[in-house]
């Protein structure tokens, strides 16, 4: 397979969102992939996240994320981009996009293209089978594949590297 574009999601792939919710907010985050979330759980989580005005810039790297990113970015360069969602305006996270840019530039690369969108806009970046999305959320992978792209659900950096190798990309 030849890669036209490789898009990295941030939260849960590169940035450890769940650890941030636990350590910065003192809360166990509701499952992002499960069906066991209530609107009340989400509201409480976002209320606590909002207390740290620059929450996204304070997140840690996911285990192995830097090595995974460097391996892919080192091979594909400007064919790699960040495709990350930000919270809806009702969540009051006015600095989310700016903080994600700062985070990527500080920890990964100042040169990589950043695409900051609402979650449901991600599939609009898909141009076909050779357009790859690495994302931790099942629903994002499902939507991406429905648009004809290749989705890799990130379980861990090692697992994602193995999947990229299976596709002949690494």
Stretches found by the model and what they are:
Residues 1-49:
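Active-site neighborhood of HAD-like aspartate-dependent phosphohydrolases
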Residues 5, 115-142:
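Conserved Lys-Pro-Asp/Glu-containing loop-to-beta segment of HAD-superfamily phosphomonoesterases
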Residues 12-15, 20-21, 86-90, 119-123, ...:
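Short, solvent-exposed loop/turn segments at secondary-structure junctions
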Residues 59-61, 65-97, 104:
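Substrate-recognition element of Asp-dependent hydrolases with the DxDx(T/V) motif
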Residues 92-99, 123-127:
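Metal-dependent catalytic neighborhoods of phosphoester/phosphodiester hydrolases
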Residues 100-115, 169-170:
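Structural recognition of alpha->loop->beta junctions
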Residues 132-166:
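Acidic, Mg2+-coordinating phosphoryl-transfer loop and its flanking beta/alpha structural elements
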């Amino acid at each position: 397979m030849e890669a036209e574009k490789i898009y990295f999601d941030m939260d849960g792939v590169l940035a450890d969102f769940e650890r941030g919710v636990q350590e910065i907010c003192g809360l166990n985050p509701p499952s992002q992939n499960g069906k066991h979330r209530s609107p009340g759980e989400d509201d409480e989580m976002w209320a606590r996240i909002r207390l740290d005005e620059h929450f996204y810039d304070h997140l840690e790297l996911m285990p192995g994320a830097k090595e995974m990113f460097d391996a892919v970015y080192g091979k594909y360069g400007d064919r790699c981009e960040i495709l990350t969602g930000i919270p809806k305006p009702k969540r009051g996270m006015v600095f989310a996009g700016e903080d994600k840019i700062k985070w990527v530039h500080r920890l990964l690369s100042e040169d990589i293209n950043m695409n900051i969108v609402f979650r449901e806009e991600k599939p609009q970046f898909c141009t076909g089978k050779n357009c790859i999305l690495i994302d931790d959320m099942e629903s994002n992978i499902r939507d991406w594949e429905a648009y004809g792209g290749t989705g890799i659900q990130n379980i861990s950096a090692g697992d994602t590297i193995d999947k990229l190798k299976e596709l002949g990309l690494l």
